[in-house]
Amino acid sequence: VSSSRPLVRLDRRSFLVALGAVPVAAALASCNGNDSASKPPAGPDLSGMDRAVRPQDDLFRHVNGTWLRTYQLPPDKTSFGTFTEVSDRVEGQLKDVIAGIVDPKDGTPEQQIRDLYDARMDEATLDKLGLTPLSGLFAQIDGAATKPDLAKVMGALPLGGLIGLGITVDQKNSNAYLPSIGQSGLGMSEQYYSKPQFAQYLAAYSTLLGKLAAGGGLPDPNGSAQRVLDLEKQIAAAFWDNVRTRDSDATYNLKSWDEVKALAPEFDWEPWLSGSTDRPKELFAKIVVAEPSFVTSAGRIWAATDIAIWRDYLKLALLRSYAKYMTKALSDANFEYVKVTAGVQQRPELWKSAVGVVDGNLGEVLGKLYVAKYFPAEAKDRAKQLVDNLLAAYRQNFRNSSWMSPPTRDAAIAKLGKITVKIGYPDKWVDYSKVKVTRGKLVESLLAITAFEAKRSMNKLGTPVDKTEWGMTPQTVNAYYDVTSNSINFPAAILQAPFFDKDAEAAVNYGAIGAVIGHEIGHGFDDQGSKYDGDGNRKDWWTPQDQAAFDAKTKQLIAQYDVLVPEGLPPTDHVNGALTVGENLADLRGLMISLAAFRIDLKTDKPNYTDMFLAWGRNWREKQTTQYTESLLANDVHSPSEFRCNQVVRNLPEFYQTFGVKEGDKLFLAQDQRVSL
């Protein structure tokens, strides 16, 4: 159960290149960019602008229209935009750093990085090894004679399994870790198994399972694939939808171990837990159950399904996870599925996949090498200035709020004062020295890393929460708010142009990185984050009247987004306002507060906001395949980029003042329909 709120969706499909690396320190600057005396501050990037589109009608296409019309999406990408522009730029730096590692000493971080990279690059060896890397795990599955035996094996496998087990921070005691269980066990989004609009995805998945079963040596491959697909359909039917799973009230169900077992008495809990971890049983005396009704259904499905089908299910889950790193036939089968579900036409270059493997599995090891070279410690202080200005603007907003009563205002300001700001990279790094990465053995090395991470996670039980730990690597082009540590986190990689530029005018930095910072702070006060106090604990600090007022604003914003349909899609493919409301609230607050911080910085109540809004529009430049857009609409808690730009500004008086927006303009929103926070 994650408590983190990233700025953009992180779990991009695995065939895409992992996000970026860290920029040079020179990309950082004070918020007003006045430290460059040799040339005037740079304005917003207008190279993609379409002046035929009025900002009053469509700010997103006014800023990006020419680029959207002329840019051709590369055949190996599902999307490209400002975030991928930055990540592509720094991805090459990751490659260069890895290439600079020559004959590293055995057991060093450099050896781990280089050998993992080289193992991914050696496709001939991967093809030659065939199924050998998984043979030991297959033998364990086949050796399980009974369901209790198989439950123990399932717990030990590097998979989510039927019921997922993880470690989370206790929402009611943010200094303690708790084990958590919840829904798991699918190869696709649960919606793809039943909704008619995803029928082609289901067909492609069925084909993939058949090819994996054949390539994996399963007897009766087509029959095995169909039986596993039917099983996954049953599991998917028990899933909570993604609106319900983001409700932190509904997903916090603290149970004793006996109560957990009583939820699903048919499931073999004891052997499953012993396979999952060797930690003492008493550490599992209390467990958070995220989706209790799913657990109950999972127990029934476990009992009703023949053990032979479960064996095939686990084998196909392993093959699905590692197919792209095995024989050419299995890798090709995996990519054929990706082509259908994501709309890409060709694979990325092999080196990009290899960089992604290193970044995705040894990201902190790689990140430490990067920040040592490109991001000196003093750079944190320079970025902190802008954060401080945003916090000051938030404080002013709460103090002057017309809809919050004094007790709620005071509590909000108190929480704001306790926010921890983390910039660039962690102060201490995870020690991966005990992980064995073996040259020429990619899958075995990945299994070793996965086992290490699982053990590291389980070892947190019984220890105080480490609130200095990061949930992203420094080379990640993103940012996030963590609710149980009440922290905002800005990896080094996002602190560069076009998000943050030392040579840019203040308006540009406030419209770009300023709004990003405001967004992350805003998550502490969105529909879910507002349920926690400054120490990261669940606490109701709102008066009933203020809570009702906030709920009304939230419902109003949900209604605004529910009617939005991305360009080129049918009317039925509209934004899910309830799913995206947390991010929409953070987007709205983020830009609203950044506008206020801009005023504070310039010491005027009436600055020229034009360049700030243009920079805001540039933030959300993005082009996607239709398949990827459809997938995100169904699954992502973020709205499509065009609405993250346009719908936010429709609620802001500064936008109306700056561009003279009036009734009849397409972005005009009646005063009584606007949401003010």
Language model segments and positions:
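Short, solvent-exposed loop/turn elements at domain surfaces
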Residues: W67-Y71, M188, P498
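Active-site-surrounding "flap" and adjacent substrate/cofactor-binding loops of secreted or lumenal enzymes
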Residues: P40, R54-D57, H62-Y117
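Noncatalytic, helix-rich "gating/capping" subdomain that lines the substrate-entry/channel surface
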Residues: A99-N389
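Intrinsically disordered, low-complexity linker/terminal regions across diverse proteins
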Residues: S87, E266, V288, P292, ...
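Short, Gly/Pro- and small/polar-rich lid/capping loops
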Residues: S38-S47
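Hydrophobic/aromatic-rich, well-ordered segments within soluble, folded domains that form packed cores
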Residues: G48-R69, Y192-A213, V581, L588-I593
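N-terminal secretory signal peptides
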Residues: V1-L10, V17-L28
